Structure formats: structure tokens, C-alpha cells
Swiss-Prot record:
Catalysed reactions, as listed in the record: a tRNA precursor + 2 CTP + ATP = a tRNA with a 3' CCA end + 3 diphosphate; a tRNA with a 3' CCA end + 2 CTP + ATP = a tRNA with a 3' CCACCA end + 3 diphosphate
Native source species: Bacillus subtilis (strain 168)
Swiss-Prot/TrEMBL keywords: ATP-binding, Magnesium, Metal-binding, Nucleotide-binding, Nucleotidyltransferase, RNA repair, RNA-binding, Transferase, tRNA processing
Name of this chain's protein: CCA-adding enzyme
GO molecular function list: ATP binding; CCA tRNA nucleotidyltransferase activity; magnesium ion binding; tRNA binding
Annotated binding of CTP, by residue: G27, R30, R111, D154, R157, R160, R163
Described purpose of this protein according to its UniProt entry: Catalyzes the addition and repair of the essential 3'-terminal CCA sequence in tRNAs without using a nucleic acid template. Adds these three nucleotides in the order of C, C, and A to the tRNA nucleotide-73, using CTP and ATP as substrates and producing inorganic pyrophosphate. Has no poly(A) polymerase activity.
Lyase in keyword set: no
Family: Belongs to the tRNA nucleotidyltransferase/poly(A) polymerase family. Bacterial CCA-adding enzyme type 3 subfamily.
Positions of Mg(2+) binding: D40, D42
Note: A single active site specifically recognizes both ATP and CTP and is responsible for their addition.
Binding residue positions for ATP: G27, R30, R111, D154, R157, R160, R163
A Pfam family assignment: tRNA_NucTran2_2
InterPro entries, A to Z: Bact_CCA-adding_enz_type3_sf (IPR050264), CCA-adding_enz_C (IPR032810), CCA-adding_enz_firmicutes (IPR023068), NT_sf (IPR043519), PolA_pol_head_dom (IPR002646), PolyA_RNA-bd (IPR032828)
Amino acid sequence: MEKVFIKALPVLRILIEAGHQAYFVGGAVRDSYMKRTIGDVDIATDAAPDQVERLFQRTVDVGKEHGTIIVLWEDETYEVTTFRTESDYVDFRRPSEVQFISSLEEDLKRRDLTINAMAMTADGKVLDYFGGKKDIDQKVIRTVGKPEDRFQEDALRMLRAVRFMSQLGFTLSPETEEAIAKEKSLLSHVSVERKTIEFEKLLQGRASRQALQTLIQTRLYEELPGFYHKRENLISTSEFPFFSLTSREELWAALLINLGIVLKDAPLFLKAWKLPGKVIKEAIHIADTFGQSLDAMTMYRAGKKALLSAAKISQLRQNEKLDEKKLKDIQYAYQNLPIKSLKDLDITGKDLLALRNRPAGKWVSEELQWIEQAVVTGKLSNQKKHIEEWLKTCGQH
């Protein structure tokens, strides 16, 4: 049993010693079986939320009505959820009623995919009622029960299924893929924020190419913001190795570039995904820097971060691997610029006012920009004395 489970065992044992059933469930069990890095450890129990709260000193109520309590144990947090069944779903995304039950199998039956519907006992035995291990061995994404039923319960499960394809390198079972194509319009009921989270994870997976192609084949892409008329662009975009990028800003900049979205249309496209303003601004800045010649002024205006991001995207459009030497050369060229911002100039607006003996006006910022360009391009050294002499010689203003 992995360390993360051993660390969580006291929580399981406290529940069991109090006369309750308790198991590790979900993604942690899947990743353990696959020998992958394990993320959050979740626990399922037949103890009611009130009973869970009484058994542990430190708890947080994050959704008691749905059976979920966070247990704080040592320096970790564990989501402890009561076995439950869910009745009719509202808006294809949330159950109208939750009923607490005593059967682990019935609880696991409501989960989305077989690979996520396994449990583990306190002694490390995996309980697999729906063939999750077999599907992992065969690298197949399959729903628990009829896919149409699962997707009508929560339409986001369609996008989640394709996201797991990308992350795990699996394929969809034929019936799961057919059901996505049939039920795709249900995704319109899901909030943009939830779709954005899944889509970003999909892009970052090692098998994003196959996943994006599945979005195209099932036409699920039509239910994603700004994609409806982008089928051909999406086909070519699927070839891009998004997994080699390291930030959200790079991810969305690469998407803009590969989809052929022009800069004037970029804000509308990115806002449709309800991205934070900072991400939108930086992604557009990277896309704007992309494709420009690497002269001194371009590098200066771009800044180190956007410059390297644009260079990475440019390289990855030609090759799946980054050329670290070229990136270091670009970084070196940037580091050797005489100044990195207007603040680095050895002369200020106040100095210009004194030198010119003129009242303040637009001319001050214009003259600073003129000096800035001369310094960046190497025509002028960044020393106050030289700048003042140069200004007198040039007779600017």
C-alpha cells in the first residue's frame, strides 16, 4: 500500500472501529492500480455526515446535504462522503435529491466511469464491481452502466471521458463514443467554468491529439465556446503538443495561434471561456509576440516571459521537442538588452523638464520614447551625460 494511503489509514480505522464501513475510493484507487502518481485520497463510508463530524475533532462542512465532510488529519485533508444514491437530475448536472444508503456497490454504481468506480479496503484489497481493472488493462474508457443514463445525469461526463482519454492514453469504448455523439447537445446545460477546467486538462494530456480528434468525430466540440465553425482549424490544431507548455497563458496563446484566431477576435474568444482577465491579457500578448522578428525592440516590448513563451510555441509548431539551446540563446539576447523597461533609463521626465526649460506636456513622454528606442537599439548608451549631449546634438523639440 502506497504512503498516501498509509497516511490516511487512521481516518479509515476510526470510522471502522466506530462500527462503520469505510473505503478508499475513486481516482486514488485507479492511479494506485495504474502505478501512477496519486493525487487526493477520497474516502466513502456508510456513516452519516453528522456521525463523521462527531468522530473527528477537525472537520469542514463542504456539502453535508450531499454527504460530504472534509476531515483534517495531521497536515492532510480528506473528503469523506456518505454512501448515497441520486434521484432525478436537474438541468443534466445536479441531482434533485440525495439518499444516504449502506451499500458500497450501490454508491459506486452512480459514478461516471468504471476506472473511477473502484474501492480499496483498509488492508489494500481492491473491490471492483464494474470491471474497472479490466478496462484499465485494455486501456478503455467505459461508463458504469448505460452511457446515455450517465450522460443525462451529468452532461459534463462526456467531456470528462474524452479528458481521461487524453490523460491516460486510452480509447473510448464504442458504445461510450456513440452515446457522446448522440447526447452531445446536453453539454450546453453545463456551466462554461466546468467545461473550461476539463478542456484545459484535456489539452495538457499526453494523448491530446487523439482526444481532440474524438471531439471532432463525435462533434462534441460544437458545444464548446467559440468552436462551432472551427472544425478544420481544430483538425490541424490537434497535431500540436500542448503538453509541452507549462502555463495557462501559454496554453491559450497556443490555441489562439493554432486555431488561426486573429488578435482583434481573441478577447471575445477567450472571454467566452470565462478566463481570468490576467490570463486573457497575457495569452494575447504572447500571441502578438509570436511570429515577430527577434530584433531588440521586439524583445524589449515583449518582455522575457512572453518572449520565451512565444518562442516555445513557435518551436513546437515545427517539432514535438523544444530546442533548449535556442531558448537559452533568446534568453541571453534578452538579458543583454541595455534596458528592460523605461524605468531603467538613466534620465527621467523631470530631467527633461529641467534640460528643456519647458512646461510639462505630451512632448515629455514622446521624447522619453525616442530616447528609449535609441538606447534599446544600441544607437545611444544609457548614461545621463551621453543622453543629454545626444539630445542637444539632435536638437529634438
